[in-house]
Each structure stands twice: as C-alpha cells, then as structure tokens.
From Swiss-Prot:
Catalyzes the GTP-dependent ribosomal translocation step during translation elongation. During this step, the ribosome changes from the pre-translocational (PRE) to the post-translocational (POST) state as the newly formed A-site-bound peptidyl-tRNA and P-site-bound deacylated tRNA move to the P and E sites, respectively. Catalyzes the coordinated movement of the two tRNA molecules, the mRNA and conformational changes in the ribosome. The keyword Protein biosynthesis applies. This is Elongation factor G. GO terms for biological process: ribosome disassembly. Keywords: Cytoplasm, Elongation factor, GTP-binding, Nucleotide-binding, Protein biosynthesis.
Amino acid sequence: MARQVSLKDTRNIGIMAHIDAGKTTVTERILYYSGKIHKIGDTHDGAAQMDWMVQEQERGITITSAATTCFWKGNRINIIDTPGHVDFTVEVERSLRVLDGSVALFDAKSGVEPQSETVWRQADKYGVPRICFINKMDATGADYFMSVDTIRERLRANAVPIEIPIGAEDKFVGVVDLITMKANIYKNELGTEFTVEEIPSDLVEVAEKYRAELLENIAEHDEELMEKYLEGEELTEEEIKRAIRTATIANAMNPVLCGSAYKNKGVQPLLDAIVDYMPAPIDVPDIKGVDPQTDEPTTRKSSDEEPFAALAFKIATDPYVGKLAFTRVYSGTVESGSYVYNSTKGKRERIGRILMMHANKREEIDKAYAGDIVAIIGLKDTTTGDTLCDMDSEVILENMEFPDPVISVAIEPKTKASQEKMGIALAKLAEEDPTFRTYTDEETGDTIISGMGELHLEIIVDRLLREFKVEANIGNPQVAYRESITQAAEAQGKYVKQSGGRGQYGDCTLRVEPLDNPEESNGIEFVNAIVGGAIPKEYIPSVQAGAEEAAQTGILGGYPMLDMKITLLDGSYHDVDSSEMAYKIAGSMGFRAAVAKAKPILLEPAMKVEITTPDEYLGDVMGDVSSRRGKIDGMNPKNGVHVLDAFIPLAEMFGYATDLRSKTQGRATYSMQFDHYEQVPNSISEEVIGKKNNK
C-alpha cells in the first residue's frame, strides 16, 4: 500500500489537561467533525469513543492513552489521548515522548489547575510545541482573559490569543478571529454551521488591542515582518499564519483559542490551528539515539528512505487480539510479516499484523511509514520503551525514564484456585505499565503490588476482576520506606571456615559514609581504594556484590538503603582457601557491621502536594496539613481560592481524598507526586520498625 498522506501533512499530537478540563469531549468532537464518528459520545453519560476501558467509562476519566487517526483538510492527524490524573503521569510522559506537538486544554472557570502544571512541565522537558484551548466557555464563571493570565503567570508561558470569545457563560455564541478580524457566530446546536460576520461593535476595541499584541509578538520572531510592522504596512493572512507557525514550533509562543467542546463550538478552528501551527515530523529535530555497537550518539531523519527505527511506547492487552504494542515509526518503513530487531533487548522480532487504531476500532494495514503511530501484533519480547530497528542498521533511541512506585499493598486472591491466574494477570499488567510492580515478600509470602497512588492500585484490582476474572482482596497500603546513615564508620568483615579439606577465607575492611549530595546519585556508590593487592583484583567485584546485596535489606527494618558511599579500604587473602563466595559473605558482614556503627536512620517518601481550596476552608486545610506532619512551602491566593504547596509524608496521606472532601464539602482538590526521601522522626521510626520486625 503506497503512502496515503505525505510527511509534511502528518501531525502527531497529544491532548493534555487537568482531570476535568474536558479532554475526552474535545477529542470526541475532533473525531466527529473530521468524519470518524457518526454519533457523538459523551463522558457525561459514559459513552465516549476514546475512553474504551470499562473503568474509564464508569469513572469518567481517561486512563490509558488510546491512539486515534483522523483526517482534516487533506492532513492526517494522529491523536494520543492522555490521562489527566496525577496517578497516571507515566502515561503522559510516555505519550509526550512520541508526539511532535500538543494541545493543552484549560477549563475557562479555573484556568491553570494543579495537574495542568505537572503536565506542562513534562512537555517542557521534552520540548513539545503547544497550542492552548480554553474550553467550557459556556460554563458559569467562565473567564477567558483570567485563564490566559493564569497560563502566563503560573506556567510562565508566552500565551498569545489568536481568538477572543463573543460572550461567555450561556451567552457564549462564537469567537473573533484575530487573524482575519472577522466574527464566527455559531448557528446550530451541533456547531457544524457558523456564519462569518463583522465584529460586534462592543468588541472592536478589545479585538484591536489583542490583534496588536499578536502582531508585536510574531514580529519579534521574524525580521522581515518586524520591518513591515514598524513601517505600518498591512500583514497578509499568510504572513501572519506562517510567523505564528514558526514561533510555535520554536516554543517561543503558545497560540490560545477558545470554545465549548460540549456545546460543539470552536472545534473546527482548533482543527485548523493543529494543521496550521503544529509541527509535521519533518519540522522537529531528528530523533537522537545511540549505536549499540560503538556506543556513539547517532540520529535518524524523519524519512521513508532512512533505515527503519521505531519506539514501542505502550503495551496493551486486547481481549481479542492479545498483546498490542503501540509504536511510533520515526524513520523508514515496516511491513507486516517482516522481521525487525529489538535493539534494547538484543532480540529478533516478527511483525505479525499492523493496525491503524481508531479509539477501540481497528483497521489492518500492510505497511507503516515514517511518522505513523500504529499498533503492532506479534511482538513477543518487546516492552514499553523498547526500540525496534533494521537488523543491519542498529540504533537504540533514547529511553524513557519512569519514576519508582511509592505505595504498596498486599493482595491475595479470594480463592486459592485463582492464585496462579492472579500471578499471570499481574505479570501482564506490569508489562503494560512500568510504574506498576509486583513481587513476593519473602518473609511473609504475600504477593505485593506497588504503584503511583491509591487510585492507580484501585484500577489495577478492578482490571484483575474485569479482564482476568480474578477476585482479589487487598490489605492496608504500605509505604516504601528506605534506610540510610548519618555518619561515617569503618568495620571489618571476616569470613573464615577451615575445618579439614578446602576451607573458605574472605577478609575486607569497609568504610561507609553518607553522600554529600544524594540528589545526584542513584542510591549507593562503591569505591575500591585498595593499593598493593591486599585483595586480588578478581575478588573485588565479589566484595562489592556482597555489600550491595546487604544494602537491599537495611539493619533497622530490612528496607533498602540509599544515599551512601561504600569504600573498600583493606583486606587479606589466603592462597588456597579464598573464593568469590567467601569475599561476598565478608563484604556483606563488613557492610552490616559498619552500618550498625554509622547511626542508621529510617527514611520515608515525602510527597509534593498541591491543594486548591476555597478561602473559607483555608484554616481547616492548613491545620490538617500540620496534623499530618506536613510543611507548607508556599501559598498563592487566586479568585476566591488559595493554592497551597506542601510536603507531606506519604504515610500520612492515606484516605486524604475522603478527609479533604468532608472538610471542604467536596470543594477542594489536590494532586500529589513523589518528591524526595526524608528522615522519619524517632518516635514514629521506632513504631514502624517495631511493626515490621514483629511480623
């Protein structure tokens, strides 16, 4: 099958937003107007096309980013729908990694909300160009200009309106296009018909002010336009659009549009803006990678002629076809039935079938081209973040980084017969989601599942029941504690066993000390400071392995140890009896003895929590933060509400959603994410260790 749409007419975009800004509704309307759906589905009644998991339809939130293809004015738009709940930030990171541009949605009543900031920062990290769409202009309290101000203030973004609304709340009837300086007035309920009219007289002055601001902004990024603008010449529509496109792709500005997706107003201009201002795959820098043979950096151009390279950014299990690998093709082409190389795993894979996804409907194609986002069936060893490439032109594209889980619960099947089934199901879910882990606690024999928050684990348990028919009970949440030390200490580890026949002999002296700046480390550093061969070279890795293994179970409560440096200072050996095993045991003994002298402490995860509360509940909310051992880091009043930034230990956050709702009659919201580890106060530390050791 020949390429249907050229690369320059392809757009890979995401839609990112806070949990309730109307993201799924906007996607629905885009699919409706671009002719993919004949009846509009609504999140309000649980029938949206993109929210295809049952849990999503019940909760009215989007959990997995479904990939959808649609066409608009001869362009192909691939849309990745991303979740807005903070427990699912991994899905957002994952989709931003494979997008070329994004539409950031905001709720016109509240402007920037906590999760909008998190998602915006993630998009900054990947340098994704964005246009802003201020949705829900028909809602009570909608305020377009306030929303634009919050984008500028809280996100420090150069948000520049290219439309302004005509009316607001129930009087919202259309928009003024600042490029053409005409008014688009919507005539029918479905928003498919609108008339282009002169700007209403009461809006002319405001429109002229914002148009001048737009022209000044784009002139800054285009010398030719700057000259014309300063000389008072009229700029053509084409020139303005070209300049907006250049500035947007360079991340120098964010065009702002508005509408009400629910009331079908403003969606077609948004589609036009996606085509006009979002980059095609050829407009973004070449994808970076590493040549696995030489470890040298390399790049791949977005072109069908280049060797094949693609990134599997999401694995999903489909009830009918099994494992789907959602994949972004960066360069080259790939055909169904062909063999490719998974360079991350070093394994050959066969491409079974290639599907173009439309929410949960699918169309089979026989070939995928550069710039396409497709689902591949038949990959056995491929997991999230793996690179697929040509056998004879290897590359590993930069991998994605995923945060470690912060909350764990014990889980057991309701019937013993389901034990094996549960194990298989959990393994499948862990394959789909790198922030979800499952393991067996060796001391208690319990199966433990870990994730990014209570909602994340609730949904996992839900999916066990629905997709795998496994009923499970879960225990109380457990916090991922860690241990560390507060001072330097030295100790000897000596393992000698000589009772006839070949004995064992390992002897080492280790120093442990806290790291100066733990933020830059990955937990534990090992340094060999032995000179003069006190321990033969071949045994040093064994000492390191013994010490690092011992660091996995600290001496206070058996939690993994963090933020410390281990130095091998000295040792001795025996010509006959020394062995790798003996040095491994000696390394472990020396480490534990040194840690015992180094004033060990317990660490707990501290969460960065952002709480948005109406002013009248501020005192109660602050008091509650203090009672949870929280520290308030900043306060930001805005329009009758206060936004509090706080650091609160995760151990104190269980059930917080319910408490906050009852304290504020459901009017406050919060979001949290892991920030750092900090020392647990002594009284609590003793209680935690006591509980752990009495198990």
